[in-house]
Structure formats: C-alpha cells, structure tokens
Amino acid sequence: MKLDLNNFDQLMDEAMKGRPGPLDEASATVLMRQMMKRIYERALRGELTHQLGYEKHDVAGHRSGNSRNGTSPKTMKGELGTLVLDVPRDRNGDFEPQLIAKHQTRLLGFDDKMISMYARGMSTRDIQAHFQEMYGVEVSPGLISEVTNEVMEAVKAWQSRPLEPLYAIVYLDALIVKIRHDGRVENRAVFVAIGIDWDGKKDVLGLWTSATEGAKFWLGVLTELKNRGVKDILIVCVDGLKGFPQAIETAFPQAQVQCCIVHAIRASLHYVNWKERRAVAADLKPIYRAATEPQARLELEAFASKWGSKYGSIVNLWNSNWETLTPFFEYPEELRKIIYTTNAVESLNSTVRKSIRTRGSFPSAEAALKLLYLAIRNLTAKWDTIQGWKDAMNRFRITAGDRIDAALALGA
C-alpha cells in the first residue's frame, strides 16, 4: 500500500494541535505513541472489516449474521512505552486479529530488543532499568526470563541441525563460565566446536557442558556430530583435551590430531612474568614458523639454551607434546597458517568474554548456553570464507583425495 504523505502530514498536524512551540524529546515520544496507537487501531478495524466483509454502517451488514460490537482495551508494551489500544470486537466473538494475537502483550520488536540486550551481556536489572529509562515501561524479571527462555527452543534446534558431511578442520576449545550451584559459584567448562567445511566456510558446530572431561564425554560429542551428518574430519585441532585421542580414534580413525599452537603459546606464557612475556613470545615464534620439523626442533633447542634455566617448564611442555604439536609441518605454508592461526577461535573467545564479563555468574548451565548461543549467532553472521582456501583444497586433494570424495558422496 502506498503511503499518502499528505494524509500523513494532516495526521501530524492534528496530533500537534494545542502544542505550542517546538517539540522536545519527551513530547515527541508522546506524540509518536499517540500516532502509533492510531495506526494500530486503524489496522485492527481494517482486519475486522475484512473478516465481516462490509464497511461500518454499510447496509450489506444487515442480516449478515454478525456485526461490530464496540471495542475492548488491550495494554501493549513496545519500544515507545505502554500503549492502550481499543481493539474492535464482533458480536459473535469470532474475530481474532492477526496484527496483534489474542494473548499477545508485546508489540513487534519488543522481544527482539530485549534478547539483543541479553546477548550483549546485560543483566536482568540492567534490562529493567533500560526499558524504564528509555520507554517508561516496567518489565519484570519473570517477563525477561520468559522472553529469553524462548531462545532455548532456537538453541535446541541449532544444536541438532544437520551438518556438512566433510570438515577439513575442526577446532575444539573450552570456554569457562561461572555457574551458581548449591549456594556456591563454580567454574564450568563449555566446550565449543568450530568447523571449516570443504568450501572454506566457518561455523560453530555445537556447544556442550560437562562436569567431567574424558574419553566417554568426547566420544559422545563426536558421535553426536556423526549422527548429525558428519562423515569425516581431516584435521582436529585441540588443546590437550583429556581423553580426546582415544575418542577421535574411535569416531574418526583417519583424522589427524593437531594440538593447538595458540593454546600451547598461551600455556607457555602462563609461566612467564609480565615483563618478559613479549620477549618469550617472540622467541617461541621461530619454532612454529620454521620451514620444516627438523628446523623447528633446532629452534626449540635454541629457545632452551636462552630460557631453559629460568623457564624449563616451557621447554618440557613443548618436548612432551612434540608429536601432536608438529603435524602441521606436513603441509605448505599457506595451509599451516590456517591450522595454527586459530582466528575463528580467538574471535569467538573475545566476543563471548565481552558478553559474560558483566554477568558475573549464571543461575544454571542452561542460562549460560542461552547467552553463548546469542553471542555466537551474532558473530558467525559476520564470518567470511577462509582466504586462500582454493590452495588448501588442492593440497588436501593430494593427501586425502579418496577420503574427501567418499565423504562428499555419502553426504549427497
């Protein structure tokens, strides 16, 4: 329907009658609320006319079997505050508006705004204060919980959605959240899987919580991925997760396990005093940036000569995990960066930390999952295809062409 600007101006003029001088922000909000009320009520009257099949006072309504029967007030909450709408009724009680459903109490966009604030990490109290300050609307903690609980249905659908048959790389990482339990606050790990599919597209495959971590837990996670359609994974990048090697060997026996270089660096710097962190990080870089595995071994020896007496624990960490830290040396430089430079993991961690920082702790693991899902949904919408992925595809074709074809064929 085309908007008649002349009629709109007339509506504005009528609404502003008796208002001397320029409008301030508060007056403009009141005016917009009045106009919104008129727009909704006009649309509702139009719905009733459509259902009855005749205009008000039209003789066609005589002996039609139904007629208009006044209005009833309905209080709605929206971005402009509280609106009391006069909803038209019919005598038979058959009229059920589509614009505003029978039991609806919030206007379109109200819930989305609340969920958006929740996703940014705002607490229930912050959301209440925001709606009161901006819109003059009181929202109860129960309402906020009701609205955000609707997100769990989306979480369940997302967590069970079908996945791609083949993932070239899957990163498994853990996020730490604080959960209130029996009057105490406990650290709980939420495990996240990020996959790069055969077309070079990144996605978060799922979230899982567990009080304990081991082969049984990880086998359950990997079995879930298989049940959702994953046929094969070429490389799995992990952070020394307990029980994972046994689980991956059972679920995806041909997958290559690569310990995450970023996490190895982070674990190394955990031992270093603040003043020397930059220098130590710079001296670790030649190890994982070496051209070959033997050269990397020489660089580790050089690092040990310089820092071993003070930070022998770092040298031990790299030596004891050497076999799972170095598989990426089998691949060319352009593919190595994709494997060990886990930008997707780091960007996800950064986004999630911002969201949970203001929350303090969560009343349950489910509440944490809601917030993590919303933060992830907003982030992944911005992710692009991996740069230089065509070269990576060609390399994977050389080393695992039969596996790739088999997985893609099974998923077709």
Residue ranges of predicted features:
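Short, conserved DNA-binding cores of transcription-related domains
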Residues: 1-101
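Active-site phosphate-binding and catalytic loops of NTP-dependent enzymes
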Residues: 50-63, 153-165, 177-182, 359, ...
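RNase H-like nuclease fold core
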Residues: 86-91, 98-104, 137-138, 146-238, ...
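Short, amphipathic alpha-helical "recognition" segments used to contact nucleic acids or chromatin
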Residues: 109-121
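DNA-recognition alpha helix
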Residues: 125-136
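Conserved beta-strand -> loop -> alpha-helix junction used to position metal-binding or nucleic-acid-contacting
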Residues: 235-242, 247-283
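Acidic/histidine-rich catalytic cores and adjacent linkers
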Residues: 286-412
